[in-house]
């Protein structure tokens, strides 16, 4: 046990990003309520980052925006997509964190030098294999590895892997592949009836899955940052 009362450590979490395309409070509230109703177990009280890049030209009351989103059933972690200094001041005044998205560009010489000193951080681990049914309320995570389930996955269960996910049975729960952001990850399933499928943060709720593939043996992947699905057999 540590001798210090608290420890502050870095970690990684997968968060959903709520992209706002309309600044109307009434529209936002109704849209969030409708979305949560589609998958309440997954989305109710879920932490989200609000991206305001699409409505950057509008005047936003961030205190009111936070209240609207949280009253609708989500929990606001921070704001992203803001590039205007005055708007950022308004976000800070609303006591909301500003989260920056994107990559840091390094000078070529520094980048080349970094490559010579690269050390793998996330070493792929041995595949995690589950032989028993996954029941409602269960949550299985395979960090830095693939996840294989050799049985059925009930509604309300959740499978998460940093790599690929294979389900050799009926999938009625939720599955998230590429949880750490690996866009090359796939989902393979012999009978798709999922509440939610997600790869590297891109997801479909049950009503967004093309009906032609429901109940079928399928694989899902990302193409140009969009989910795609095709039959396995």
Curated annotation (Swiss-Prot):
InterPro entries: CAP/MinC_C, MinC, MinC_C_sf, MinC_N, Septum_form_inhib_MinC_C. The keyword Cell cycle applies. One of its GO terms (biological process) is division septum assembly. It holds the Pfam family MinC_C. Keywords: Cell cycle, Cell division, Septation. The keyword Cell division applies. Cell division inhibitor that blocks the formation of polar Z ring septums. Rapidly oscillates between the poles of the cell to destabilize FtsZ filaments that have formed before they mature into polar Z rings. Prevents FtsZ polymerization. Belongs to the MinC family. This is Probable septum site-determining protein MinC. It comes from Proteus mirabilis (strain HI4320). The gene is minC.
């Amino acid at each position: 046990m540590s001798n210090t009362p608290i420890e502050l450590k870095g970690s990684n979490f997968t968060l959903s990003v709520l992209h706002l395309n309309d600044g109307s409070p009434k529209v936002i509230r109704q849209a969030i309520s409708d979305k949560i109703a589609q998958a309440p177990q997954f989305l109710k009280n879920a932490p989200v980052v609000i991206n305001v890049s699409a409505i950057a030209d509008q005047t936003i009351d961030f205190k009111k925006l936070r209240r609207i989103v949280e009253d609708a059933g989500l929990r606001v972690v921070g704001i992203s997509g803001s590039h205007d200094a005055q708007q950022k001041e308004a976000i800070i005044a609303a006591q909301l964190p500003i989260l920056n998205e994107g990559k840091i560009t390094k000078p070529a010489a520094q980048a080349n030098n970094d490559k010579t000193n690269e050390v793998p951080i996330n070493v792929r681990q041995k595949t995690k294999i589950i032989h028993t049914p996954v029941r409602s309320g269960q949550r299985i995570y395979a960090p830095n590895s693939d996840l294989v389930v050799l049985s059925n996955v009930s509604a309300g269960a959740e499978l998460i892997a940093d790599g690929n996910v294979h389900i050799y049975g009926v999938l009625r729960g939720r599955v998230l592949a590429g949880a750490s952001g690996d866009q090359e990850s796939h989902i393979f399933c012999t009978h798709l009836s999922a509440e939610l499928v997600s790869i590297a943060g891109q997801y479909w709720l049950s009503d967004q899955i093309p009906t032609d593939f429901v109940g079928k043996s399928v694989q899902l992947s990302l193409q140009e940052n969009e989910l795609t699905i095709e039959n396995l057999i």
